[in-house]
């Protein structure tokens, strides 16, 4: 990867080694012949080289029945690549935008390349394209990152209408710069795989557990197509909604329990009935649909 993120094992030797387009085409032909419908491109920053990214996107068009999963850095999008993305057919790409955080001190400590303003502009563009449904990824447990900021940062991402908002826990993997600096940064992490962060100078063990519960809430409601629109509207119209809804799920002892799609709909309906009755009808319609 071209990036220099202190928490990532993909920060390796430079320049980046690449496969030829013809070699990738031959591999995709074999994949296609075996009827595989989803291909995940493992490059951590697919768009590090705009010209090559454009060539690959044109190659992917030769396989319209395959869905390609890509991870991009929205701050590094060139105008040429933006135009190429606009022309792609719907459903060809599953895009994950590596935002990591909306806080400059967090990104600086993590050695994340690119300006935050450029990253947000790139994400906003993706979310505005009718043929795209980009997913935004945040990382809980990064240095200088506080619990209340996780809740706050969901709001602008929902405002962009990101298809999914993922809040993952930081893992301090062996060989990474951040693991070497863990003691200096005040990071405590599990000694066992996957080496998940337990607490930092900015966030306690209990608060990280709350962050994991927030992640479950987002996965179960915002990231679920059936409940996405209603959950997004509730987030945007009440900045305290995530706090209140999470407290509600904890109070009824369901936040850590597996829930069917129908069960989640009933929970959302009951919450609206008790706390925001103006959304009760909308919750009923979403459940029926």
Q: Whereabouts are the PLM-identified features?
A:
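Short, hinge-like loop/turn segments at secondary-structure boundaries
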Residues: 57-59, 86-88, 153, 181-186
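Radical SAM enzyme core and accessory elements
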Residues: 214-289
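Flexible glycine/acidic-rich beta-alpha junction loops that bind and position SAM and/or redox cofactors
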Residues: 3, 50-51, 99, 105-110, ...
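Canonical Radical SAM [4Fe-4S] cluster-binding loop centered on the CxxxCxxC motif
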Residues: 1-22
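Conserved SAM/AdoMet-binding glycine-rich loop
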Residues: 21-143
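Conserved residues at the C-terminal ends of beta-strands
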Residues: 11, 42, 168
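Acidic/polar loop patches that form or flank catalytic/metal-binding clefts of enzymes
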Residues: 39, 68, 134, 163-167, ...
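Catalytic cores of alpha/beta
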Residues: 80-85, 143-161
């Amino acid at each position: 990867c071209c990036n220099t993120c202190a928490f990532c094992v993909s920060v390796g030797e430079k320049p980046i080694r690449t496969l030829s387009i013809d070699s990738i085409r031959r591999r995709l032909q074999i994949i296609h012949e075996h009827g595989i419908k989803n291909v995940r491109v493992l490059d951590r920053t697919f768009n590090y080289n705009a010209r090559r990214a454009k060539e690959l996107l044109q190659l992917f068009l030769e396989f319209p029945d395959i869905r390609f999963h890509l991870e991009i850095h929205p701050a590094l999008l060139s105008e040429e690549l933006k135009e190429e993305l606009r022309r792609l057919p719907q459903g060809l790409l599953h895009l994950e935008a590596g935002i990591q955080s909306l806080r400059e001190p967090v990104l600086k400590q993590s050695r994340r390349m690119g300006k935050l303003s450029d990253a947000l502009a790139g994400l906003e563009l993706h979310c505005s394209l009718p043929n795209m449904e980009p997913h935004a990824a945040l990382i809980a447990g990064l240095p200088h990152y506080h619990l209340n900021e996780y809740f706050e940062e969901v709001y602008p991402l929902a405002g962009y209408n990101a298809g999914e908002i993922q809040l993952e826990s930081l893992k301090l993997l062996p060989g990474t710069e951040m693991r070497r600096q863990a003691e200096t940064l005040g990071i405590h992490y599990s000694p066992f795989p996957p080496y998940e962060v337990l607490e930092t100078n900015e966030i306690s063990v209990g608060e990280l557990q709350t962050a994991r519960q927030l992640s479950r809430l987002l996965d179960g409601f915002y990231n679920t197509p059936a409940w996405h629109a209603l959950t997004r509207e509730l987030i945007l119209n009440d900045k305290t909604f995530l706090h209140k809804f999470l407290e509600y799920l904890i109070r009824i002892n369901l936040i850590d329990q597996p829930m069917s799609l129908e069960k989640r709909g009933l929970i959302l309906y009951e919450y609206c009935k008790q706390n925001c009755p103006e959304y009760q009808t909308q919750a009923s319609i979403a459940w029926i649909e």
